[in-house]
Amino acid sequence: VLLSIYDLLFGKQLKKNHLIAAHYTVGTDLNPLNAEHYASESFALLNQQAAKLNIQVDNHYRVTDKLVQEIIHFVRKEHPDMLRLGAGSHYRSDMPGTPGALLWLTLFRDKIDEIMEQVKCPVAVFVNRQYREGSAVSFVLGGMIDLFLFSYLDKMLQNGHSVRLFLFDTDDEEFRGHIDDLQVRYPEQTMIVWFAGVEDLVTEEKDGLLIMSHLSYTKLSEDEAVMRELSSLLVIRRNKNTGDKNEGLEN
C-alpha cells in the first residue's frame, strides 16, 4: 500500500528518488535481540514489494521515548521531499546525509498535528480504510487554495490514471480555468462532480482513495459521523518552504 500510494503521486520519478521507510518503537527498555526482530518484521512486506517494483528503499528503525522530537530531528536532517505519516483508520484534525528523500512513518494520530507544526516539507497523512491498489482515485479541490495539488493530479493523469474530481462549487474564474484546461487535455480520464458538503464525498466504492489538502480536510471534518463513511484518505499539507528548486515534488 505504501509504495502504491507513492507510485500514484510520483510515477516513474519514484525510481529516481531515495526512499526511506522509518519505523519507531516507543520505549527505552527493549531487548536488542527483540529490537532486531521487530525491525525485520516491520519492513518485510514493504521490502518485498520494493524488490518487485525494482525500487531501492532504506530501512530506518529506532527505539525511542521521545517520538515526536525524534521524527522532527530526522526530517530536519534528511530534508525529504515528502513526509508520509500513517494514521490507522481515523485521523483528527531517510538515511543520514541524503537530501531529497521520501520518508514515511507509522505514527499515533495525536502526534501528527504537532509534527506538522514543526516541519516545513509537504506532509501526507494516510488514513487506510482497506484501500486496494488499482481502485478509484478522487481529488477534492476546494478552489485556488488547493492549487498545489494540481502538480500531483497532473502527474497522475500523465501516467494514464483516471481521476474523479470533487470540485467545490465556486465562482472563481481562475480555478474554473484550471479545471477546463485539465478536461481539454485529459477528456477521457477526468470525471467532474460538483459538491457542496462532505456528505457529497461518500461513494459506493469503499476501497478507493480520496486525496485532499489539509486545509480542506480541516474545514470538512467537523461532521465526524460522515467523515467515517469516506473511503481511505490521503491528506496533504502543502510545502511550507518557498523558492525550492524541486517544484514538481514539493508543491
Where is each model-derived feature located?
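Intrinsically disordered or low-complexity boundary/linker segments at protein termini
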Residues: 1-14, 81-251
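Non-transmembrane accessory domains of multi-pass membrane transporters/channels
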Residues: 1-44, 50-58, 143-149, 159-162
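Soluble catalytic regions of membrane-associated enzymes that act on cell-envelope
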Residues: 35-65, 74-78, 82-90
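Short, internal active-site loops enriched in acidic
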Residues: 7-8, 63-67
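Short hydrophobic/charged patches on amphipathic alpha-helices used for structural packing
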Residues: 68, 72, 199-202
